[in-house]
């Protein structure tokens, strides 16, 4: 994925306007609610019985925050996302057996949550830049399969 200087600027602007931890929790909760089969990856997270339980689950929120912080850190490695995510890719593949399609699903949910959070400030240019980033992240995480 090729990110232009303008894309990088847009990504930084987006990340500067959101609470990354809150966004991450919201994104992971939505992933689990909208894609119920993904609950199998979080069986030790406690109560995942309803939308409300998932959205308030401290383990879901904490892990979502961790995921988004990883994406923020990845923005420091945009020219080599595959290397940055190499170990995590192998872990998700060999230890957790995560279907790499879930990375794409999560990416789409990040875009939805950004749009809900930023509303009119989430221009088509910002969306394009962040979609490029998330495509790169998804590809890098799926590379260890």
UniProtKB/Swiss-Prot annotation:
Tissues with expression: Red blood cells.
Keywords noted in UniProt: Heme, Iron, Metal-binding, Oxygen transport, Transport
InterPro entries: Globin, Globin-like_sf, Globin/Proto, Hemoglobin_b, Hemoglobin_oxygen_transport
UniProt binding sites for heme b: 63, 92
Keyword Iron annotated: yes
GO biological process, one term: hydrogen peroxide catabolic process
Keyword Cell cycle: no
Globin domain sequence ranges: 2-145
GO cellular component terms, semicolon-separated: blood microparticle; haptoglobin-hemoglobin complex; hemoglobin complex
Pfam families: Globin
PROSITE patterns (UniProt xref): GLOBIN
Family indicated by similarity: Belongs to the globin family.
Protein name (Swiss-Prot/TrEMBL): Hemoglobin subunit beta-2
Organism in which the protein naturally occurs: Triturus cristatus (Great crested newt)
Gene behind this protein: HBB2
């Amino acid at each position: 994925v090729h990110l232009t200087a303008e894309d990088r600027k847009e990504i930084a602007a987006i990340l500067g306007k959101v609470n990354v931890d809150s966004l991450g929790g919201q994104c992971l909760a939505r992933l689990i609610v909208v894609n119920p089969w993904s609950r199998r990856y979080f069986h030790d997270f406690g109560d995942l019985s309803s939308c409300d339980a998932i959205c308030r689950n401290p383990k879901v929120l904490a892990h979502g925050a961790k995921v988004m912080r990883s994406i923020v850190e990845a923005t420091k490695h945009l020219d080599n996302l595959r290397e940055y995510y190499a170990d995590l890719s192998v872990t998700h593949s060999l230890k957790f057996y995560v279907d790499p399609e879930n990375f794409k699903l999560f990416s789409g949910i990040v875009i939805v949550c950004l749009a809900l959070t930023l509303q009119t400030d989430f221009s088509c240019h910002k969306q394009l830049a962040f979609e490029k980033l998330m495509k790169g992240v998804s590809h890098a995480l799926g590379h260890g399969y």
